[in-house]
């Protein structure tokens, strides 16, 4: 890890495995981003997004846009790449002694809907955990939009049977995403569909840079919660699924380093712990390890190992939490 004595300049290009690892004494909760569920539906291009929304209109699903991942009665997702969310992370941390909860909220719901669904699930999950204390305390680790859900929950949902000790966000658009700006602009000017109802889920509007200015004003941090954050940046090859989104974000943000969807500046919230070097928006949930071999075979290239071991990255996060007494 390179540190230029400024938090904003911390570049993480490798992760050292802790010499003596001790898991946090309180459970870790993983909160997914846009799409999400137990599988991530990756949207690599605006074309696929257009096709997806068009299909939802045909199936009269506009008001419940992809809110139920369980429904696989047709092939409306065939043009999308589906991968498991948090690949291998839960099992790895459990093997190290961590208590881990993975959550599932409406993939394309609003921040408010997702936060309420997250709370409802946590209310149930904590009852399953044995504890000497009557009231459970949790450490939240969130990717992308999941971090906004968590901030809303902490700020606005009070009647809980659990406490939040910490929130660690990874590539969360705390100040919005220029890619969301682009998508909203595109569909507001897309006359070809000509439908009277709003076809773009509200979550896309909530992820814009303009909306997040409002969100941040009305969603203050809790003094009882410790906030940590990480960002990612990379420069894509032509075949990377984030190549076009990266260019859009780069141009609209006037040259800000980004991970293909979120700039480093937007990722910063609370104590900024550093920027993962050469990582795109999905590398941080370990998806590359799953697909890298097949991807390399497709392009007849040699598999290249990642500079940052993602499993060790999460091990370091949880080790840091444990050392802080969480």
Curated annotation (Swiss-Prot):
GO cellular component, one term: mitochondrial intermembrane space
Organism name: Saccharomyces cerevisiae (strain ATCC 204508 / S288c)
Subcellular location: Mitochondrion; Mitochondrion intermembrane space
Motif (A/G)XSXG lipase motif boundaries: 142-146
Entry's pH dependence statement: Optimum pH is 8.0.
Subunit (UniProt): Interacts with MIA40; forms mixed disulfide intermediates with MIA40.
Record keywords: Hydrolase, Lipid degradation, Lipid metabolism, Mitochondrion
Its EC number(s): 3.1.1.3
Single annotated GO MF: triacylglycerol lipase activity
UniProt function note: Mitochondrial triacylglycerol (TAG) lipase with activity toward long-chain diacylglycerols (DAGs) and triacylglycerols (TAGs). Involved in mitochondrial lipid metabolism.
GO BP term, example: lipid metabolic process
Main subcellular location of this protein, as a coarse class: mitochondrion
Catalytic activity: a triacylglycerol + H2O = a diacylglycerol + a fatty acid + H(+); 1,2,3-tri-(9Z-octadecenoyl)-glycerol + H2O = di-(9Z)-octadecenoylglycerol + (9Z)-octadecenoate + H(+); 1,2,3-tributanoylglycerol + H2O = dibutanoylglycerol + butanoate + H(+); 1,2,3-trioctanoylglycerol + H2O = dioctanoylglycerol + octanoate + H(+)
InterPro entries: AB_hydrolase_fold (IPR029058)
Gene3D superfamilies named in the record: alpha/beta hydrolase (3.40.50.1820)
Record's protein name: Triacylglycerol lipase 2
Leading EC class: hydrolase
């Amino acid at each position: 890890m390179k540190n230029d004595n400024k938090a904003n300049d911390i570049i993480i290009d490798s992760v050292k495995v802790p010499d003596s690892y001790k898991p946090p004494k309180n459970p870790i909760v993983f909160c997914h981003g846009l799409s999400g569920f137990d599988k991530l539906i990756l949207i690599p291009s605006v074309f696929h997004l257009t096709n997806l929304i068009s299909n939802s209109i045909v199936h009269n699903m506009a008001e419940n846009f992809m809110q139920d991942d369980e429904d696989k009665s047709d092939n409306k997702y065939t043009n999308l790449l589906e991968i498991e969310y948090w690949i291998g992370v839960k099992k790895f941390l459990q093997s190290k002694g961590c208590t881990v909860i993975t959550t599932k909220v409406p993939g394309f719901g609003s921040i408010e809907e997702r936060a309420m669904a997250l709370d409802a699930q946590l209310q149930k999950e904590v009852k399953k955990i044995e504890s000497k204390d009557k009231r459970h305390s949790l450490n939240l680790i969130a990717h992308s939009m999941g971090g906004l859900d968590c901030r809303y929950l902490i700020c606005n949902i009070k009647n809980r049977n659990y406490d939040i000790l910490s929130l660690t966000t990874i590539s969360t658009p705390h100040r919005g995403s220029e890619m969301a700006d682009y998508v909203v602009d595109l569909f507001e000017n897309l006359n070809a569909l000509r439908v009277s109802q709003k076809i773009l889920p509200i979550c896309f509007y909530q992820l814009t840079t303009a909306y997040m200015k409002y969100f941040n004003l009305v969603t203050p941090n809790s003094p009882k919660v410790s906030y940590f954050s990480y960002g990612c940046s990379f420069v894509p090859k032509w075949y990377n699924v984030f190549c076009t989104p990266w260019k859009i974000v780069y141009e609209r943000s006037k040259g800000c380093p980004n991970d293909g969807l979120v700039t480093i500046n937007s990722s910063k919230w609370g104590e900024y712990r550093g920027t993962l070097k050469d990582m795109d928006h999905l590398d941080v949930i370990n998806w590359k390890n799953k697909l890298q071999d097949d991807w390399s075979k497709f392009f007849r290239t040699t598999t290249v190992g990642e500079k940052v071991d993602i499993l060790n990255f999460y091990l370091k996060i949880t080790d840091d939490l444990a050392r802080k007494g969480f």
